[in-house]
Amino acid sequence: KEGNAIKKEADITPLRPADVKLLKNYPTVKLTKGAVLYSDFPNSKIDAIAPELEGMTAFCLNAENQRQEGTAIEFTSDDAVNLLVGYFRDDQKKYAKAPKLETDASANDYGQAEPKLTNAIRIKGMPLANVHSYHFPAGTHKLLLPKGYTLVLGFTDQSVTPRNAALAGAEETMDWMFY
């Protein structure tokens, strides 16, 4: 579309992974179609992914541990970074709740309240996920994510341009307007 800056997928370049030192031994995987992000769900492979996320260094976590204990990410960075976290578009208890200012005063402590990429990742057998960006200055940090399944999609030193990655079908996109 002319005038309104709607990017075509061909114009979208992948985000650059940032250099961070992880303070725990988290298993990682390169984000690409077919990758597995849950060690205990080997058949839950990525079916589709927003082009911005292609090649990021994601974490391969244990979903049941996330559900029981939540997820803690500890890291050090020499520069400001954004940690990308995917929240599934489903309100079942097994999925972590996305940050919402209406119900959680800390929901924007890291600039994460609004999703940056909606309908951005589709995993076999799971709902679509939206991507939120948590911003951290240089230094040592510990992020505690809520209990439930989330996707830890990696660190970047670039900002994420908000958009609908449109991996949903037409009906799902309409549903999203009323979500």
Where are these regions (language model features)?
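Activation corresponds to long, low-complexity, non-globular regions
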Residues: K1-L23, F136, L144-G148, F155-Y179
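Residue-level detector of intrinsically disordered, flexible termini
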Residues: N4, E9, P17, D47-I49, ...
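Glycan-recognition and processing domains
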Residues: D11-Q66, A168-Y179
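Extracellular and analogous surface-interaction loops
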Residues: N62-N65, E69-N82, H132-H141
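A short beta-strand element within beta-rich, extracytoplasmic domains
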Residues: D79-D91
